[in-house]
Amino acid sequence: MTSTSALPLALIQLEVPPAIVVERIGEQPRWFIDALDLQPDDYLIVRPHLGESLPQFDQISGAILSGSWAMVTDHAEWSERSAAWVRAAIDAALPLLGVCYGHQLMAYALGGKVADNPNGWERGLLPLRCKAAMQRDALLSALPERFSAWLSHRQSVIAPPPQAQVLATSEKDPCQILRYSPQALSVQFHPEFSRHIMSACLPPDVSDSVADADIEGADWARQLLTAFWQQTRPQASQAQGA
């Protein structure tokens, strides 16, 4: 039998960035690998847009669904296939974290509505506000009432799935963090981003001043990402055979 400690985290890459972005900073999995300091045995990369099969649930410890330059409302074949996989993964109680496109895809897969945000783009380092229910969330209770995170998106979750709990908002987006089950959540912001990644992702017609700011003090979004990763790991006592 495969040891739980050997199971990798699936990094589900949803489409590929523009060539100029890839040239500067690589593709989405690299950003998560660097943010979490993952070693080669810690993860596997799955690319549904290249026709790759999504992983069997008993072969992975959890999954992160990446951001994308695509739109959920385009209903691409690979996106719809990934949405069906999300529904099955939720039923299987697999730890899931959706980020930006992944956030919208999870909400859509579970019955929410995704569309262009009527309030327009969110870009750059922006303040978020957590709801009181966050303090009762086992994974997220350490987050402060307010923190800043990197954002870059035009579409949003306009209406969350009926069973989802909204845990954070921003000025332009009422669904910044959604909790679907004890194992599954999604975030509209980019916990894997740094100022360098944000700057590299800006299109030519957007001022570099969007990325002028930087996080001061604790990077709470990154801590959320790290906490999710640790959630997928076996307990230390189990790893030691206690």
Question: Each predicted region: which residue ranges?
Answer:
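Cysteine-nucleophile active-site neighborhood
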Residues: 66-134
